[in-house]
Amino acid sequence: MNYLKQYESFFWLIGIFIFYLIMAILTPLSTTDWHAYKVNLSQYLTQENGRYLGHLFEWVAVHNVILKALIYAITSFLVIYIVVYMVQLHTNRIYFILSFVFMVTVPNTIYSETYGWFTGFFSYIPATVLSLFILFMVVKIIESHDTVSEMQLWVFLLVSLFGQFFLENLSIANSLIILIGMVVYFFVKKRLSYFLIVGFMLSCIGNIIMFLNFNYFLIKDGLNTHYSISDSQGMIHKAGVTLFKLVPQYMFINQMIILTAVSYT
């Protein structure tokens, strides 16, 4: 009995992983997923938008059931693990359980666009994992650069580049996170961080590679019937509204209200 108690947290984590394995097996392929199944890899990557790694993972997943289940389960598990690890609560199983419960009780509209189909999953969830890792590393570098291992720094640089090929919004967000981290690091430490500078440059290179995809030029010109800009005044106006109105509102103002409310509960 004591032996089982000692490894109770491990059993919970295995249970969460197995749950996502089962969900991957039970989730049917959507029309878009079948399209990825029917075409060869080079054709799929050249015809679609700049989410190159997302499309690569999706293509591999729909062609191999075992890899599909493993990638789905590992990525879903990493979201929970990184969230709990970021707040240094990974030693207590209750926080893994709470995070898992919150993840599986999201509104069905959100679930259907993320976990409910593999095209959405491989665009949103890996991008979320990598963005969380970038945020974690930026905060850790600012707080105490000496505690960051060399391996973590090299992984951070790789993620800064390759994390840009999943989702447009998070690709831009990754660059902003690193840029803000550079500024904060300079004011706190009175010097520049080599790794943050290189990470920012790599993230910008990734953004350039992504947005040079011809589909984005078709979207800008209104020639792509599958994708469109949700702003009648064009792409530049939409970008301005997003950057100067929506981002401050939902990243800072609303979050401060939420955090203030939580602090008094």
Language-model-detected regions and their locations in the chain:
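Start-transfer (signal-anchor) and selected internal transmembrane alpha helices
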Residues: 1-19
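Membrane-interface helix-boundary motifs at transmembrane edges
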Residues: 3-4, 84-94, 142-149, 185-195
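Transmembrane catalytic cores of multi-pass membrane glycosyltransferases
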Residues: 23-67, 169-176, 183-264
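Membrane-interface micro-motifs in multi-pass membrane enzymes
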Residues: 47, 51, 101-139
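Hydrophobic core segments of transmembrane alpha-helices in multi-pass, intramembrane catalytic enzymes
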Residues: 72, 76, 123-135, 173-181
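Transmembrane-helix motifs of polytopic, lipid-linked glycan transferases
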Residues: 73-95, 133
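Hydrophobic transmembrane alpha-helices
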Residues: 80-85, 132-143, 156-160, 176-185
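Membrane-interface alpha helices of multi-pass inner-membrane proteins
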Residues: 152-174
